[in-house]
Amino acid sequence: MADLRVNLFGKQLAGPVIAASGTFGFGPEYAGIEDLRVLGGISGKGLTLNGQPGNDGERLLETPSGLMNSIGLQNPGVQHFIENELPAMKTCGTSVWVNLGGHTIEENVEGVQKLCAAGIDVLELNISCPNVKQGGLAFGIRAKDAEEVVSAVSKVCTVPLVVKLSPQAESIPDMCKAVEAAGADGISLCNTFQACAIDLEKRRPVFNNTFAGLSGPAIRPIALRMVWQAVGAVNIPVIGLGGILTGRDALEFIMAGAAAVQVGTANFLDPKACTRITAEIGEWMDAHGVKTLDEIRGCARG
């Protein structure tokens, strides 16, 4: 019987699959559907220091091999989460990851301080948010901007700090090196790709903001390439995500060197995707005589 446990940040996780932010609520919503204890963790719906109403207009559009979303970080805010969502999230029997974004360095720092004090397991910093002090350019585009925000956050973060990277970064290897140098304990990538769709009848973009984030199997080969680059650039753990639908998909990321994986869009297709993929990984390992994930992690790199 394969041992699916993963050692990450000095702790042992039950499995290599973590539910990705924005696709799994805060966790309790799925507690009656699947056994969450077999997961490596749950990264809850993305938060900002203060709540946001999200975007107007269309928010979701299915593509031939993916999903476009323009949610706009709708969320109740950090304090509401701490008081109303976190207690139930802690009962799910798996590692509590909290995804946080902010429009200024100060917002990020204050949010991290509050969340760490509330008792979470991992802080996942989303640096795809626009930096209002840099003309709206996301923190995750230029390495120097990412290094600045991660450095400030790492000084106050008392739990493992995972930085979630944007695929729009100018250079994935340089970005990874910058956030590692700034104090990140791990990296997750990649976030959604910017995409566009046109409504032919209205003769205008489907989404009010013109562009939306593309996820799903269409991006998987590109995400895998970026994970490969990240693993080769840094010495901290890399969590791979982007279009994982099956155990075989997840194993590709692990063989590329990922310490663990996150599953996102697949949860919309199959509410049991995370536990199913975990089981499929174990089945493949048993069929191939692989006892632990360490035996195959990074094996494709030679």
Language model features by range: what are they?
Residues 22-23, 242-244:
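Active-site metal-binding loops of divalent metal-dependent hydrolases
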Residues 244-248, 270, 302:
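Small/polar glycine-rich anion-binding or flexible loop at a beta-alpha turn
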Residues 1-96, 102:
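N-terminal capping/small domains of soluble enzymes
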Residues 48-53, 130-132, 194-197, 268-270:
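Short gly/pro/ser/thr-enriched loop/turn and capping motifs at secondary-structure boundaries
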